[in-house]
Regions:
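Extended glycan-interaction surfaces of carbohydrate-active proteins
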Residues: 1-11, 35-57, 61, 68, ...
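Well-ordered alpha-helical scaffold segments within catalytic/enzyme domains
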Residues: 9, 17-30, 70-87, 151-168, ...
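Short acidic alpha-helix initiation/capping motifs at coil-to-helix transition points
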Residues: 11-15, 155, 173-174, 207-209
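Short coil/turn segments at secondary-structure boundaries
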Residues: 24, 58-66, 86
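Generic short alpha-helical segment signal, independent of protein family or function
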Residues: 24-28, 38-45, 54, 76-80, ...
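Extended, well-ordered alpha-helical scaffold segments
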Residues: 28-42, 85-104, 152, 156-184, ...
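Active-site cavity-forming subdomains of large catalytic enzyme subunits
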Residues: 66, 70-76, 80-114
Length: 257
């Protein structure tokens, strides 16, 4: 397993899947990577891997929309390093189950909308990496269609297409409509970037780094001139010598240190 922050934090699904390629694949620890995939796959429930494993004897928690999608991305990287499609074949039924649950609906309002995009969220529950919560107050709730979640969803579908082709099954997993809906609805022409969130009340124009996932995942959703504009926007508003801000200083909600 991987610990999110020894000794304060235990196993977190999101952190594990994001860190796994760097910790296990680049370093040649492929057996350990395989064991981690198996451990999380064994705890898939209603199409979701755990957000975290609490202390011994306690049930896993599932309040995350992105950890399960990062599982696909990490597995794809594993296959690029190992070519171990026999292992992917073992996970294939679980992967198909995950996609089915996301299409029909699972916990916390996570489901595919009529446009093919993934929507998620309910009051009082934090589901994305922006998961700060003070008492009952979710600081950044992001209920609706977050930009990075839909980039991850698109990548999960493209990875399913790749695996289906390898396994001689129907490779049409519905990725193309997601790409079309994403580019139509997330593009913010006013700033030359992507909306951070789509909601029934309208899009959220907050300039955040989440939009970068539409460019940086294995299967990019945005390319060419739009991609260049996004990078320029992020560089102008978010880049610092210490990394990326999570919100543009021009935003009314921005709080400096």
């Amino acid at each position: 397993t991987l610990l999110a922050g020894y000794h304060w934090f235990t196993d977190w699904g999101r952190d594990t899947m994001i860190a796994l390629p760097g910790i296990c694949l680049v370093t040649g620890r492929h057996t350990e990577a395989k064991s981690i995939f198996q451990a999380f796959a064994a705890h898939v429930s209603a199409g979701m891997i755990p957000n975290r494993f609490p202390d011994v004897g306690e049930e896993p928690e599932y309040n995350t929309v992105d950890a399960t999608l990062w599982f696909f991305s990490a597995l794809y990287k594993y296959l690029q390093y190992t070519g171990d499609y026999d292992f992917a074949k073992e996970l294939w039924p679980t992967l198909k189950e995950i996609v089915t649950w996301h299409r029909t609906g699972t916990r916390y309002g996570i489901r595919v909308d009529a446009d093919g995009l993934l929507t998620a969220g309910e009051e009082g529950v934090q589901l994305t990496w922006m998961d700060a919560k003070v008492g009952d107050w979710v600081v950044t709730p992001r209920i609706g269609k977050p930009v990075e979640i839909n980039a991850l969803w698109y990548n999960a579908l493209k990875i399913m297409e790749h695996l289906a082709t390898e396994f001689g099954e129907d490779a049409d997993c519905g990725a193309d409509p997601v790409r079309a809906a994403f580019n139509e609805q997330f593009w913010n022409a006013d700033c030359g970037g992507l909306f951070d969130l789509l909601t029934p009340c309208g899009p959220d124009p907050a300039i955040r780094p989440n939009q970068l996932f539409a460019l940086s995942l294995p299967f990019a959703l945005v390319e060419g001139e739009r991609a260049a504009q996004i990078l320029a926007l992020v560089e102008e508003h978010l880049l610092t010598p210490r990394g990326l801000r999570s919100l543009s200083p021009t935003d009314p909600a921005y709080r400096a240190r």
